Regions:
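Acidic, low-complexity, intrinsically disordered interaction modules
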Residues: 20-73
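Mixed-charge, Lys/Arg-enriched low-complexity segments
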Residues: 59-94
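N-terminal compositionally biased, intrinsically disordered segments and leader/signal-like regions
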Residues: 12-13, 56, 76
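Generic short amphipathic/hydrophobic targeting helices enriched at N-termini
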Residues: 5-6, 10, 29, 74, ...
Length: 94
């Protein structure tokens, strides 16, 4: 798999994460500068009331993309209990 194919796989997984966590995972529109595509992903951190940002670039090698993706998923695992609590509160309001 070449690096652009790998980038497509990583970004498609991120879009699935966004759809599963309404408003808690934000994805900035993909940008391209000098042939390098980049995608910024923000994970909501309730404790700090802000987003932790991760940037994925098509110029990264597979190892860098994989490491960044694993770090992001690890952060999501830590945040999941808080996200579940937020989601329950949202459902109760409706």
């Amino acid at each position: 798999m070449n690096i652009l194919d790998y980038y497509e796989v990583v970004t498609s997984k991120i879009f699935k994460l966004e759809s599963m966590n309404e408003g808690l995972v934000l994805i900035a529109p993909e940008q391209e500068v000098d042939g390098v595509r980049s995608l910024m992903v923000g994970l909501y951190v309730p404790e700090h009331e802000r987003y932790k940002m991760y940037t994925f670039r098509s110029s990264m090698n597979e190892g860098e993309l994989g490491d960044k993706y694993k770090a992001m998923v690890g952060t999501m695992d830590v945040l999941k209990p808080d996200w579940d609590r937020i989601s329950k509160k949202r459902r109760k309001r409706v």
